[in-house]
């Protein structure tokens, strides 16, 4: 398969590059920056263009991807805690999906997260469960999922939204300390104890397992939704 990964450098995107290359697939990369400042694993072709570039359609046409994976919630190009980034996140996603729709090249996978749900839920969450995120980042992701659904239904785009539930990894850089496992370990180092909420249970997803799940969806021929 020909794979196009879209996103800033992070542990997840680099592990995806390693996985797809190991399985014999050709991987190309759209960094979202004019000048590549961050390190990535080696790929077949790297495109240093921003998401609002007029060249997006040309890039997708050149790569001719069987699968395009947008890092979405895990795209390090965005400052997710800042409200003014919301317009950028939405407009960039529209540009990317519009280019994918115009070129009609393969299917698209958008990575979202459990943050689109907030609070405790007595019943198991389903794909159709109403979204109830809280905070700036959650609002951005809910809007992004809405955009994805619009392109699914109204533009006929073969698009899958994958919500990665409490993703965690072993941090190698300070910027990797951004998930609950790492934050709890950091709290323990600073205070000597870990604070937990009583009667609050949730699952954790190891990054390597997430990579395997994403790979399985990528090679699956059927259409998916969320």
Model regions: which residues?
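N-terminal Rossmann NAD(P)H-binding glycine-rich loop of SDR-like oxidoreductase domains
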Residues: 3-23
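Conserved glycine-rich Rossmann-like NAD(P)H-binding loop of the short-chain dehydrogenase/reductase
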Residues: 25-34
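Conserved catalytic-core motifs of eukaryotic protein kinase domains, centered on the activation segment
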Residues: 40, 78-84, 119-123, 173
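NAD(P)H-binding glycine-rich loop region in Rossmannoid oxidoreductase-like domains
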Residues: 49-88
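Catalytic Tyr-X3-Lys loop
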Residues: 61, 80-94, 98, 105, ...
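Conserved Rossmann-fold NAD(P)-dependent oxidoreductase catalytic core, especially the SDR/UDP-sugar
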Residues: 68-70, 94-136
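Short-chain dehydrogenase/reductase
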Residues: 86-87, 129, 133-145, 175-182, ...
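NAD(P)-dependent short-chain dehydrogenase/reductase
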Residues: 149-202, 207-211, 215-216
């Amino acid at each position: 398969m020909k794979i196009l990964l879209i996103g800033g450098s992070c542990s997840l995107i680099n592990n995806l590059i390693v996985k797809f290359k190991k399985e014999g697939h050709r991987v190309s990369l759209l960094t979202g920056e004019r000048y590549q400042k961050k390190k990535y694993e080696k790929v077949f072709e790297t495109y240093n263009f921003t998401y609002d570039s007029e060249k997006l359609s040309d890039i997708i046409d050149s790569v001719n991807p069987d699968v395009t994976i947008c890092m979405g919630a895990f795209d390090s190009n965005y400052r997710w805690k800042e409200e003014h980034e919301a317009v950028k996140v939405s407009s960039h996603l529209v540009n990317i999906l519009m280019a994918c729709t115009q070129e009609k090249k393969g299917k698209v996978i958008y990575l979202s997260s459990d943050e689109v749900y907030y609070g405790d839920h007595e019943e198991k969450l389903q794909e159709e469960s109403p979204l109830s995120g809280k905070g700036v980042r959650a609002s951005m992701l809910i809007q992004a999922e809405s955009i994805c659904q619009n392109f699914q239904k109204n533009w006929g785009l073969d698009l899958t939204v994958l919500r990665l539930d409490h993703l965690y990894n072993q941090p190698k850089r300070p910027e990797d300390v951004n998930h609950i496992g790492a934050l709890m370990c950091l709290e323990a180092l600073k205070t000597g104890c870990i604070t937990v909420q009583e009667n609050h249970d949730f699952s954790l997803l190891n990054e390597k397992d997430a990579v395997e799940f994403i790979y399985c969806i990528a090679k699956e021929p059927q259409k998916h939704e969320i």
